[in-house]
Structure formats: C-alpha cells, structure tokens
Curated annotation (Swiss-Prot):
Function: Hydrolyzes fibrin.
Principal cellular location given in the protein's record: secreted
Subcellular localization, as worded in the UniProt entry: Secreted, Extracellular space
Cellular component aspect of the GO annotation: extracellular region
Catalytic class of the enzyme: hydrolase
Temperature-related activity annotation: Optimum temperature is 25 degrees Celsius. Active between 15 and 45 degrees Celsius, however activity rapidly decreases after 1 hour incubation at temperatures above 40 degrees Celsius.
pH effect on activity, per entry: Optimum pH is 6.0. Active from pH 5.0 to 8.0 at 37 degrees Celsius, above pH 8.0 stability decreases rapidly.
Gene Ontology MF term list: peptidase activity
Activity-regulation annotation: Activated by Mg(2+) and Fe(2+) ions. Inhibited by Cu(2+) ions and EDTA. Activity is unaffected by Ca(2+), Ba(2+), Zn(2+), K(+) and Mn(2+) ions.
Entry superkingdom: Eukaryota
GO terms classed as biological process: proteolysis
Protein name: Fibrinolytic enzyme
Length: 10
C-alpha cells in the first residue's frame, strides 16, 4: 500500500 501510513507494512 503506497500513499499512507500503511506503507510501513509493505
């Protein structure tokens, strides 16, 4: 997931 805080779990 790119474009948010969720980028940390990529």
């Amino acid at each position: 997931i790119v474009g948010g805080v969720s980028v940390a779990i990529e």
